Regions:
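Fold-core signature of tandem repeat domains
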Residues: 121, 129-131, 144, 167, ...
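Glycine-rich, low-complexity segments
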Residues: 1-20, 219, 223-239
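Right-handed parallel beta-helix/beta-solenoid
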Residues: 3-42, 61
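Residues in short coils/turns that link rungs of repeat/solenoid architectures in beta-rich domains
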Residues: 85, 108, 138, 143, ...
Length: 239
């Protein structure tokens, strides 16, 4: 009954939940750090009807249900301790939802806890994500796949791995990449009427490709379409 009551209360208000993978327990209600839950799964269950779910993760490793966390029409904010100490294992799918993540590492490289051959993060049908001071570890496909009029904003985030692209944007979507680090080989691709902004990138400087009708801005300047991968530092080259 207490769990049912908690879910009912969450349907009418913003709900804040604390989770601690090391010292928490799912028998608690998660309302304070001292009463922290142990799993992200229970935190998502208790906040499933909240208009806004705010989840604080203590340092530790967390897994998502069935390897993929799917958010449908939800508003979820997840705050970690630091990206170096707070790891979320699995893949994320956001559909018509808003997801904010700060100071968290998303890792989809282990087949026991994730689907390594899939996109690490997928945004579809007007979804939105904001990632600040995060790390994304990807084994296959794209680190972030953005489609169907969705939008993404990355600040101070490092993207690693990816057999295809760090950020793949299509379907009238847009992505803003600020002071991020690219540790992939192909960087960004803009297609399908999308718009991409890259500012103050480091690492491989987010090499990009874009189709003829897509718009890419690098450090505030619009660049010409590039069908082969180039670094943003070469944007003024005629070739």
């Amino acid at each position: 009954l207490s769990t049912v009551k908690k879910i009912a209360e969450g349907s009418v208000a913003t709900q804040t939940i604390y989770v601690d993978a090391v010292n928490g327990a799912d028998s608690r209600d998660g309302t304070t750090q001292a009463k922290a839950l142990q799993t992200l799964s229970m935190a998502l269950q208790l906040t499933q009807y909240a208009r806004k779910a705010v989840i604080y993760l203590a340092a530790g490793t967390y897994t998502v249900p069935d390897k993929t966390l799917t958010l449908l029409g939800r508003d979820v904010r997840i705050y970690g301790d630091t990206a170096a100490t707070t790891t979320l294992q699995g893949n994320l799918v956001c559909e018509n939802s808003f997801l904010l993540m700060r100071r968290v590492t998303i890792d989809s490289t282990d087949s026991t806890t994730a689907n390594p051959t899939a996109n690490t993060i997928t945004l579809q049908y007007r979804a939105a994500i904001r990632m600040v001071d995060c790390t994304i570890n990807t084994a296959g496909k794209n680190a972030i796949n953005i489609t169907e009029m969705s939008n993404a904003n990355f600040v101070g985030t490092t993207i690693r791995g990816a057999s295809q692209y760090a950020v793949y944007v299509r379907g009238l979507s847009d992505a803003k990449i600020y002071t991020c680090t690219d540790e992939t080989t192909k960087g960004v691709h803009a297609g399908g009427g999308s718009v991409v902004y890259i500012n103050n990138a480091t690492g491989a400087s987010f090499p990009y490709t874009n189709d003829s009708s897509e718009i890419v801005f690098v450090d505030g300047r619009q660049v010409l379409p590039k069908t082969t991968t180039v670094s943003d530092v070469a944007m003024d080259s005629p070739n």
